[in-house]
Regions:
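Intrinsically disordered, low-complexity regions enriched for glutamine and histidine
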Residues: 1-2, 258
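Intrinsically disordered, low-complexity, charged terminal extensions of DNA damage-control enzymes
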Residues: 151-319
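Catalytic cores of DNA base-excision repair glycosylases
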Residues: 2-179, 242
């Protein structure tokens, strides 16, 4: 959960997640939709899917016990070199280097490493430094300490050098380059993406949802059918809902900001009359907004469907 996400954001999600899934067996036994439901709002949903896949593998291949070897651990979905090293260092006291974002920042500044870690040569250098710096004793304490140092003192903006125990020998501080190191990755040009989503309503208060592809935005989550144009959305309505629906009409505008782009969503509302599209298991479903089930939904879609659950708005949308 902490990958690419701040601690303050993670804590309430972590508590709910651990209450529902106290061990690997509970996680493996749960449907992936419930896992995604509890992850909804954290983003980077591949993390949740990989966590569930890893739990299944641990149960099937390792008898429900976390592997103790680096190679077996790193072979699990979603666990790379740094995560495997951190798990073994913290949980088993085994000596393995780590290179998460916090450790990378500390090492880059302390040793004065120039260049972006996205460059393979720089990444290799940082791994070498991490290996060299990892002690043979009390490795669990060191691993936690370097992560905490990067998270609370050697922060990305306005590092607190006066409080840093490594300040005296830190090359970045001695040369006044704390704000230059580590070198940032090249920023992507921010853009706006516009889409149309069909809100197909039935009289029983349910809305048609489709599962999104696992790759891409909101991977694996359930969402309103999405289209790049109103024309394509209209063709979907005529081809899939046919005589069962009136012509779509708009219902406000939704805006959502991602890390590198902004998403504008135009909801096109149709009322399904009489017969309606049959769903394909695992691909589409009718979701009752008044009695929501525990499935993975993108945060802005959850908010929108909650608005639909309001009686007056739901009735207005169906007129």
């Amino acid at each position: 959960m902490l990958q690419q996400t701040q601690v303050a954001t993670v804590v309430p999600y972590y508590r709910r997640f651990m209450e529902r899934f106290p061990d690997v067996r509970a996680l493996a036994a749960a449907p992936v939709d419930e896992v995604l439901h509890l992850w909804s709002g954290l983003g980077y949903y591949a993390r949740a899917r990989n966590l569930h896949r890893a739990a299944l593998r641990i149960l099937d291949e390792h008898g429900g016990e976390l592997p103790e070897s680096f190679d077996a651990l790193a072979a699990l979905p979603g666990i790379g070199r740094s995560t495997a090293g951190a798990i073994l260092a913290l949980a088993r006291g085994q000596r393995f280097p780590i290179l998460d974002g916090n450790a990378r920042r500390v090492l880059s500044r302390y040793f004065g490493v120039v260049g972006s870690s996205a460059e393979s040569s720089v990444a290799r250098r940082l791994w070498e430094l991490s290996e060299r710096s990892t002690p043979h004793d009390r490795v669990d304490e060191y691993t936690q300490a370097i992560m905490d140092l990067g998270a609370t003192v050697c922060v990305r903006r306005r590092p607190l050098c006066s409080r840093c125990p490594l300040a005296e020998k830190c090359i970045a501080r001695r040369t006044g380059r704390q704000h230059e190191l580590p070198a940032p990755r090249l920023a992507r040009a921010r853009h706006r993406r516009r889409v149309f989503m069909v809100v197909a309503l039935r009289d029983d208060g349910s809305v048609l949802l489709e599962r999104r592809p696992e790759s891409g935005v909101w991977g694996g989550l359930w969402c309103l059918p999405e289209f790049s144009s109103a024309t394509a959305a209209g063709a979907f309505v005529r081809g899939n809902l046919g005589e069962a629906a009136v012509e779509p009409r708009t219902l406000g505008q939704l805006e959502h900001a991602f890390t590198h782009f902004d998403l504008s969503i135009t909801p096109l509302v149709v009322r399904c009359r009489g017969a309606a599209r049959a769903v394909e298991e695992g691909v589409s479903l009718w979701y009752n907004v008044r009695a929501p089930s525990r499935i993975g939904l993108p945060a802005p879609i959850t908010a929108f469907l909650s608005r639909l659950a309001d009686e007056s708005l739901f009735d207005a949308a169906r007129v």
